[in-house]
Amino acid sequence: MLGTVNTTGMQGFNKSERCPRDTRMTQLLFPVLYTVVFFTGVLLNTLALWVFIHIPSNSTFIIYLKNTLVADLIMTLMLPFKILSDSRLAPWQLRGFVCTFSSVVFYETMYVGIMMLGLIAFDRFLKIVVPFRKTFVKKTAFAKIVSISIWLLMFLISLPNMILNKEATASTVKKCASLKSPLGLLWHQVVSHTCQFIFWTVFILMLLFYTVIAKKVYDSYRKFKSRDSKHKRLEAKVFIVMAVFFVCFAPFHFVRVPYTHSQTTNKTDCRLENQLFLAKESTLFLATTNICMDPLIYIILCKKFTRKVPCMRWRTKTAASSDEHHSSQTDNITLS
């Protein structure tokens, strides 16, 4: 077993030497795009932080939203390191820091956010499908325990990726895989497959939850013969959240497995490896834009949030006067 791991490690290192990475796109275009996402994310998530500070954590829904915000803020703070590293505006030592710490934290918080979005879908599912049934999963204590468990799980999974590395040099930091020890390469592959499992499990569950929610809402509208534009917009909200989740995260997870395989074996053609690298970076950027999308989800799903946003208070009060006739199932889509 150890011999196999050592061989894999040497293969990954040797391939780094014979297959130089094409970084023209990642060095010129992506740093500019990430800079735009960074400043937009700082603006939106700072506003969201200010709003959530003024909202008590008295429901499971709010707790999940706040944890999503924390994950997004940490992801946002990791972006400057990637921008400076990819653009080659910083010394090679920063690249070593990115490989061993900031990118690990970035991925850790991304999957925390993914699981939190799954819990938000589960929370909406319970409130609409079984709104009056009392169960422990609706208690704030449950939400806090689950949230802490998720953070702890991802930390424990990610920690070896920070530790199982060789000494950084100007040559080894060109590819993060070359910086990893043989055991680190093996662990990185295990983590990659684990994260794939997390994403697709959450996605399938979200799809089931929102399908049932949509059916419930549709049945409610049909029962009360209500087909006005307000009801149609509420129907659409269910699918907007699902669409954002899929568009941001699915492409990256289609690419990640073959990319990780290309980094941990010596069987991938050099040209294909560079194509997979570019595909991974492109879809990773798409996944990163989720830090700008989540604040929109807060506005769509949480009226407590919109009531605290200064520019939306008047709109919320105006809309409230026309919402009195809506059913409780419809309200549960947007109320916490």
UniProtKB/Swiss-Prot annotation:
It holds the Pfam family 7tm_1. GO terms for biological process: G protein-coupled receptor signaling pathway. GO terms for molecular function: G protein-coupled purinergic nucleotide receptor activity. Disulfide bonds join 99-176. Residues 1-32, 82-100, 166-193, 259-281 are extracellular. Highest levels in spleen, liver brain and kidney. Lower but significant level are also detected in intestine, stomach, skeletal muscle, testis, heart and lung. Keywords: Cell membrane, Disulfide bond, G-protein coupled receptor, Glycoprotein, Membrane, Receptor, Transducer, Transmembrane, Transmembrane helix. Residues 54-60, 122-144, 215-237, 303-336 are cytoplasmic. The keyword Disulfide bond applies. It is a multi-pass membrane protein. The chain crosses the membrane at residues 33-53, 61-81, 101-121, 145-165, 194-214, 238-258, 282-302. Coiled coil: none annotated. Glycans are attached at residues 6, 14, 266. It is found in: Cell membrane. InterPro entries: GPCR_Rhodpsn, GPCR_Rhodpsn_7TM, P2Y13_rcpt. GO terms for cellular component: endoplasmic reticulum; plasma membrane. Belongs to the G-protein coupled receptor 1 family. Receptor for ADP. Coupled to G(i)-proteins. May play a role in hematopoiesis and the immune system. This is P2Y purinoceptor 13.
